[in-house]
Swiss-Prot record:
Protein name per Swiss-Prot or TrEMBL: Neuroparsin-A
Organism superkingdom: Eukaryota
Gene3D superfamilies, per database record: 4.10.40.20
Functional description taken from the UniProt entry: Neurosparins are multifunctional neurohormones: they inhibit the effects of juvenile hormone, stimulate fluid reabsorption of isolated recta and induces an increase in hemolymph lipid and trehalose levels.
GO molecular function, one term: hormone activity
Parts forming coiled coils: none
GO biological process: neuropeptide signaling pathway
Subunit structure as annotated in this protein's UniProt entry: Homodimer; disulfide-linked.
InterPro entries referenced in this protein's UniProt entry, alphabetically: Neuroparsin
Swiss-Prot/TrEMBL keywords: Disulfide bond, Hormone, Neuropeptide, Signal
Lineage of the organism: Eukaryota, Metazoa, Ecdysozoa, Arthropoda, Hexapoda
Propeptide: 23-24
Residues spanning the signal sequence: 1-22
Organism: Locusta migratoria
Amino acid sequence: MKATAALVAATLLLAVTLFHRAERNPISRSCEGANCVVDLTRCEYGDVTDFFGRKVCAKGPGDKCGGPYELHGKCGVGMDCRCGLCSGCSLHNLQCFFFEGGLPSSC
């Protein structure tokens, strides 16, 4: 009986802690109401779906990208995020940037 009560208490504590962290997360709260409206027709490098499932403008060649919860954004089509920068050529407008720092492990 004591083991079951301890397990239930530990589970509740974990749930409350996770909920509290999610509520404090500035990333999830940065887009509320009118702040979430993005004119996707003005996206220079196309649009992507962010970590939270919202459509946002993609990052372009040489732009900062990645991070926890993709805080700095996702790269557009034709590019990938290397060492925190979009590397490759945008298939939207053919602008290019190539990360020359070697392998991503050398960031």
